[in-house]
Amino acid sequence: MSYLEPFQSVALFENTFRHQLNKKTGKIDERKFVFDKHFGDGEGQLPVVPDRYRLIWMPGCPHSNKAMITLRLLGLDRVISVGECGVLRDPRGWIFSEDLGGVDPVLKIHYLDDAYLKGDPDFVGRSTVPAIADVTTGAIVQNEAWDIPKYFVVDWKKYHKENAPDLYPKKLRTEIDELSAFINKRINAYACGFARSQEAFDEGYVSYFEALGTLEERLATRRFINGDYITLSDIHLYVALIRFHINYHLVFGVNKKRLEDYPNLWNYTRDIYQTEGFYDYTKLELIKRHYQQSPHMRAKLGNVYGLLGAGPDNRQLLSTTGREKLSADPENK
């Protein structure tokens, strides 16, 4: 891992997130998504066609993780191919560093940014993950990070595998939407990690731990966020909690408590981690490497040498939790 002068790391961080850093408020603004067409058969919509699209994800990113887990749970990886960017961001953006020759085998590009520019030659923002490319053109056509999982659930339903879980039951959709919005807004360590003022940091810090307390109480009497079965709300929460356990506590300074200090949240996280589709796409070591070693993130720790911490000890993630007792149907998730 190469040495980075502190000013170099800070400059990379500032440049990467320049479109979101609000110098007036000291906060990080929500991302603006340029490629926001919906899937469907209407005019101007993206046709729902097997083997036409490629999901691009990066294992360190929580929003990427949501999309990948949802794709896997629903069996859509049979009809939508997957490309994976490396966890160490280049100054120009995400790169396909783990592929042979550093080139995505389908899109034939090294930088994800090239697919964004194919989608819009005037694009000047930050190329983000997850993103969906049309393999017939090589262009990014959809990058709404928060909504891609829901599109997979609703718009791609006819291609779900047999006995796929219902992650968005109609009778619970309002509740799921409200809880998912709460999770994305409040269980948001980035509000602290990317704060540019003490006031912004403190506001995010208080909000973060108040929200964790609320969910700790909720999970005392139910196995999953919405009851007996995993829904989209759980996917939103899980990817945030597992990163709190691995990195956020250290890297973003949300250190009032550890995840283990919340018995219900800790057991809940382990319960979900042990579920097929979650375990296999939660790449613990890559998540840790992303937040601690990616050049654009190293400023958060003053980690000029790109060193990697040894902890945490993740063996407990595989121990039994007993949370199935909270479910009316303990044998099914």
Labelled PLM ranges:
Residues 1-333:
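C-terminal alpha-helical interaction module
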